[in-house]
C-alpha cells in the first residue's frame, strides 16, 4: 500500500515538473514601471519593441505597426499639457484603450 502511494506521489511530482518546464515560449509579462518609453530601455524584448503603456513597460509584437512603434518610442508621453488637444495624437497607438487625456497637467492614457 505504501509503495502505491509513493508511486502515485512521484508520478504527480514528475507531471508537475514537466508542466512547469513546458511553459509557452511567449515572453513573461514583466511590467516594469515607467513614465516615458525611454524608461524602458533596459527592458528586454525577444521580438518587437518595448513601449511604455499605462505606466508599464510592454513588449509589442505587431510587425505591421513597426514604423509607428519606432516613431512612438522616441516620443515623450509625459508631455505637459493644459488641455487634451495639447497631447500628441500619436499617443493613441500606445494606449490600451486607444484614448488619452490631459490629467494633472500630463498627457495620460485612460482606461
UniProtKB/Swiss-Prot annotation:
Main location: secreted
Name the record gives this protein: Defensin-like protein 295
UniProt-listed GO biological process terms: defense response to fungus; killing of cells of another organism
Subcellular location per the Swiss-Prot or TrEMBL entry: Secreted
Assigned GO CC terms: extracellular region
Domain of life: Eukaryota
Similarity comment: family membership: Belongs to the DEFL family.
Annotated coiled-coil segments of the chain: none
Endpoints of the signal sequence: 1-28
Amino acid at each position: 500500500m505504501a509503495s502505491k502511494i509513493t508511486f502515485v506521489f512521484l508520478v504527480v511530482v514528475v507531471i508537475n515538473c514537466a508542466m512547469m518546464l513546458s511553459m509557452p515560449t511567449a515572453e513573461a509579462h514583466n511590467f516594469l514601471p515607467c513614465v516615458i518609453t525611454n524608461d524602458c530601455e533596459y527592458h528586454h524584448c525577444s521580438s518587437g519593441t518595448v513601449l511604455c503603456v499605462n505606466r508599464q513597460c510592454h513588449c509589442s509584437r505587431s510587425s505591421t505597426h513597426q514604423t509607428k512603434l519606432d516613431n512612438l518610442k522616441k516620443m515623450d508621453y509625459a508631455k505637459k499639457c493644459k488641455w487634451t488637444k495639447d497631447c500628441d495624437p500619436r499617443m493613441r497607438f500606445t494606449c490600451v484603450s486607444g484614448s488619452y487625456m490631459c490629467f494633472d497637467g500630463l498627457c495620460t492614457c485612460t482606461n
